[in-house]
From Swiss-Prot:
Ribonucleoprotein found in the keyword field: yes
Role this protein plays: One of the primary rRNA binding proteins, it binds directly to 16S rRNA where it nucleates assembly of the body of the 30S subunit. With S5 and S12 plays an important role in translational accuracy.
Predominant location category: plastid
Keywords, alphabetical: Chloroplast, Plastid, Ribonucleoprotein, Ribosomal protein, RNA-binding, rRNA-binding
Family per record: Belongs to the universal ribosomal protein uS4 family.
Domain S4 RNA-binding residues, every copy: 90-158
Protein name (database record): Small ribosomal subunit protein uS4c
Signal peptide: none
PANTHER family membership: 30S 40S RIBOSOMAL PROTEIN (PTHR11831), SMALL RIBOSOMAL SUBUNIT PROTEIN US4M (PTHR11831:SF4)
Length: 202
């Protein structure tokens, strides 16, 4: 399944706030009832499905990528759900978003694809690149790249950078300090439901 490219407001009306997808918070019309909180009995499958969809749409990853992260997490020591989240959070496009270099993860992905981003002084144009502790993120030394990033940083100054990252706004340089902990995840989600959804597939 490919990435979603349809109306973003429609998605967050159904699933709730997804800051990685869009910074918009729609005002629900009077009398509007979110399907997920309607009086109808909701199946456990649907609950798990919607939690999985939150993860997919927030991080902008494909079904195949998410399933891959769950499979890797199952083979690692520790909580499968938490390790799956860490895999998504440590993607380069998400790191750029969390540093405030891009307003959304799709915006961050575009910066990477257009070769505006360097990791450890090397251009990386793979959004799914997995960042590691002590990786430093910088901007390509071109007028176009610097102009785009400066504008993005000015717009995102109101957002707090999580503890596992450091960003020097003057040098436009970010640093990955460590693998993030569960409390630093930038999304309200029950990752155990995602693991349960994939229990027959992963």
């Amino acid at each position: 399944m490919s990435r979603y490219r349809g109306p973003r407001v429609k998605i967050i009306r159904r699933l709730g706030a997804l800051p990685g997808l869009t910074n918009k918070i729609p005002q629900l019309k009077s009398g509007y009832t979110n399907q997920s909180v309607s009086n109808k009995k909701i199946s456990q499958y649907r609950i798990r499905l919607e939690e999985k969809q939150k993860l997919r749409f927030h991080y902008g990853i494909t079904e195949r990528q998410l399933l891959k992260y769950v499979r890797i997490a199952r083979g690692a020591k520790g909580s499968t759900g938490q390790i799956s989240l860490q895999s998504s959070e440590m993607r380069l496009d998400n790191i750029i978003f969390r540093l405030g270099i891009a307003p959304t993860i799709p915006g961050a992905r575009q910066l990477v694809n257009h070769r505006h981003i360097l990791v450890n002084n090397n251009i990386v144009n793979i959004p799914s690149y997995r960042c590691k502790p002590q990786d430093f993120i910088t901007i390509k030394n071109s007028q176009k790249s610097q102009t785009i990033i400066t504008k993005n940083i000015e717009l995102s100054q109101k957002y707090q950078i999580p503890n596992h990252l450091t960003f020097n706004s003057l040098e436009k340089k970010g640093l990955v300090n460590q693998i993030l902990d569960r409390e630093s995840i930038g999304l309200k989600i029950n990752e155990l439901l995602v693991v349960e959804y994939y229990s027959r597939q992963a």
